[in-house]
């Protein structure tokens, strides 16, 4: 009986520590997990590099990734010296992206915010990258058309 009580006590006392460890690390995102407007599917790094090349991203740019997920496009732009901003609705993905930027040493150039891309001002961007479905691209069209002339927009896979 004492052993059972001791085991039960040990298990109960260890739970707060386990919960604290979980709270410190964001959960690993799953490909295909549903989000507010779309499912999360990460863009391969090689394709991100091609998108940034196509936009001719330099250190003089302000890059915005709409639906930034785990932050890989923002981090890649920051590694090129650009000031890069990720707008992502999923708070866990924002935490993952922020941790990834810190791990890659670009936290000073890569920022992430939990926000609705349809209600957030990103008009100061010189480059916009996105990987969204066509209906979302169409919904974003008015915001993008109101951006400054010369703003480069690169959409992965789907037309604007």
Please give the residue ranges for each predicted region.
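Conserved SAM-binding motif I beta-strand of class I
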Residues: 83-88
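A short SAM/SAH-binding and catalytic strip from SAM-dependent methyltransferases
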Residues: 122-139
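Conserved SAM-binding loop of SAM-dependent methyltransferases across substrates and taxa
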Residues: 70-82
């Amino acid at each position: 009986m004492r052993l059972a009580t001791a085991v039960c006590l040990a298990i109960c006392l260890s739970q707060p520590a386990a919960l604290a460890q979980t709270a410190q690390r964001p959960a690993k995102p799953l490909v295909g997990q549903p989000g507010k407007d779309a499912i999360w599917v990460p863009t391969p790094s090689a394709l991100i590099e091609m998108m940034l090349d196509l936009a001719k991203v330099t250190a003089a740019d302000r890059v915005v990734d709409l639906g930034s997920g785990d932050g890989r496009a923002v981090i890649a732009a920051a590694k090129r010296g650009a000031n890069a901003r990720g707008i992502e609705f999923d708070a866990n993905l924002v935490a993952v992206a922020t941790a990834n930027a810190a791990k890659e040493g670009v936290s000073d150039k890569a920022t992430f915010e939990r926000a609705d891309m349809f209600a957030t001002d990103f008009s100061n961007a010189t480059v916009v990258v996105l990987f969204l479905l066509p209906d979302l691209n169409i919904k974003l069209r008015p915001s993008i058309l109101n951006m400054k002339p010369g703003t480069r927009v690169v959409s992965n896979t789907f037309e604007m």
